[in-house]
Amino acid sequence: MSTMFLRTLREDPADADVVSDKLLQRACYLRKAAPGIWTWLPLGLNVLNKIENIIREEMASIDAQEVHFSGLLPREPYEATHRWEEYGDNIFRLKDRHEADYLLAPTHEEMFTLLVKDLYSSYKDLPVTLYQIQTKYRDEFRPRAGLIRGREFIMKDAYSFTLDKEGLVKAYMDERGAYERIFNRLDLKYVPVHAMAGPMGGFESEEFLAPMEIGEDTFAQSPSGKAWNVEALTTPEPEAIDFTATPAAEKRPTPDAATIDKMVEFANANHPRSDGRDWQASDILKNVVIAVMHPQDEDHDEPWRELVVVGVPGDRTVDMKRLEAQFTPAEIEEATDEDLKKHPELVKGYIGPMALGPQARDGKKAENASETGDALRYLIDAHVARGSAWFTGADEQDVDYYDLVYGRDFEADGTVEAVQVRHGDMSPDGSGPLSFERGVEIGQVFQLGLKYSNALGLKVLDQNGKTVPVWMGSYGIGVSRVMACIAETHHDEKGLAWPAVIAPAQVHVVATGKDAAAFEAAEQLIGELEAKGIEVIFDDRKKVSPGVKFKDAELIGVPIIAVAGRDTVNNGTIEVRDRNGENAEAVPVADAAQAIADRVAALLK
């Protein structure tokens, strides 16, 4: 270590917000160049390379072949798939000196597709799976959590190309199995969850989430063991309610009752329920106006904005992230007061379904409705049962409906998953109530289907001489994020505690004291260990106290620590212990290398 490019820190960096970020910087694995941008130091590169090599071994086991693309890509392929617009502000765009547009690659679907199109033209060429391990770039609005959410990150992305859907499913399952082996070898706990495809497109996707509280993703698990990202969670269709005995809908004044709480208070004070119970927030249908920002498409030369109204039970909170996933590739935000002013039918605090959607288009449009175009789309949350009666807005100031029945008095243009899921909600598979955890996405697999093949013209001749599009799959692992997640789950109060398979070395040898014999014994031990193929870090610093050396060894996180010091000189022994301080023993110098080799072998099993 006297010549190693290394300076450990005693204090956490002021801007580090998660344990992995604090420890990786303190132990000199990384240094921050700018928010979300990192300089990799020798220890960090060592660990990163070992993770990458495990990935390469498992990719080779399924006959995937490695390639490498540029990180600087032309605009045109991304325009052909509409992702130049769909990514919005999330990508880095630039122009060259000739004013041609480029981007820093967020992913490489288009380039892989064009490469295969350029080289392959027959069914005899398929199937093939290609992959790369490369730096990607995304213009994160707020980089956080160190390597977990950065503006640049290292990713393994693989793409399978097959003649038909059956081939795609096989390639998908091969990659999925390889991912499980990779994460198992890395000793990283993971949960495969059903997921939304998002801007990637396709029709089947799973995420691999590492469960941890700092995760940005929430996933739900059913008693049967199945799991879903909450964005992909579907609500079991509620049983329809018989409304034959429900009174006709009635408009009633509800002055100064523009919020859920005030509606409940007013109704309980002025309109007691016939069943004797109090009005509750769950009796109210609240109607939320959102603005949907659609990207440019075949029908629109420019990105365009649409107002949509979503009806949800009054006791539930709208989950904007979950709702947005169903409008992909569009983005959504809450509508502004300026948006509402353009639509007189949207009376703030009293918005209801009768001036919206199918009922407005069927000639029942409220007298004060906008004349600027078709009625706004009206969507209903999946928790709303047909036949259910609601206390909701009447599209007039200080007026609400009572007993407005979904399916009798109003319809919707569609059903959406709009609200936050919560403990006690039923699982989609019907096995019981859901439970929830947070996690960090470490990998995702997609069955892309024909999206990119059709957009970019990737076709081959099949066995009958017919030109057919190629079926594609996409498979990603966040390599640098995986490293952070391992650090996040493998540490204690003293520092990092790497799994032996990716630690920067298997053994950290510390020489202490001023007696040259201790340093000579340490050097002899290191020579014997290296002859056995064991990687070693040697702390040979002469002017550093034993206490500092031990603290650095525990901070750096190599799994086995061997100490040559006073006991070596006096008793002819080397102290060998695990990184966590357990299983300490004094081993004769002559036997130390073999004793350590046995420990290493046990750790690498």
From Swiss-Prot:
It comes from the Bacteria. GO terms for cellular component: cytosol. GO terms for biological process: prolyl-tRNA aminoacylation. Homodimer. It comes from Bifidobacterium adolescentis (strain ATCC 15703 / DSM 20083 / NCTC 11814 / E194a). InterPro entries: aa-tRNA-synt_IIb (IPR002314), aa-tRNA-synth_II (IPR006195), aa-tRNA-synth_II/BPL/LPL (IPR045864), Anticodon-bd (IPR004154), Anticodon-bd_dom_sf (IPR036621), Pro-tRNA-ligase_IIa (IPR002316), Pro-tRNA-synth_IIa_bac-type (IPR004500), Pro-tRNA-Synthase_IIa_type1 (IPR023717). Belongs to the class-II aminoacyl-tRNA synthetase family. ProS type 1 subfamily. Its EC number is 6.1.1.15. This is Proline--tRNA ligase. Consists of three domains: the N-terminal catalytic domain, the editing domain and the C-terminal anticodon-binding domain. It catalyses: tRNA(Pro) + L-proline + ATP = L-prolyl-tRNA(Pro) + AMP + diphosphate. One of its GO terms (molecular function) is ATP binding. Catalyzes the attachment of proline to tRNA(Pro) in a two-step reaction: proline is first activated by ATP to form Pro-AMP and then transferred to the acceptor end of tRNA(Pro). As ProRS can inadvertently accommodate and process non-cognate amino acids such as alanine and cysteine, to avoid such errors it has two additional distinct editing activities against alanine. One activity is designated as 'pretransfer' editing and involves the tRNA(Pro)-independent hydrolysis of activated Ala-AMP. It is found in: Cytoplasm. Keywords: Aminoacyl-tRNA synthetase, ATP-binding, Cytoplasm, Ligase, Nucleotide-binding, Protein biosynthesis. It holds the Pfam family HGTP_anticodon. PROSITE patterns: AA_TRNA_LIGASE_II. Its main location: cytoplasm.
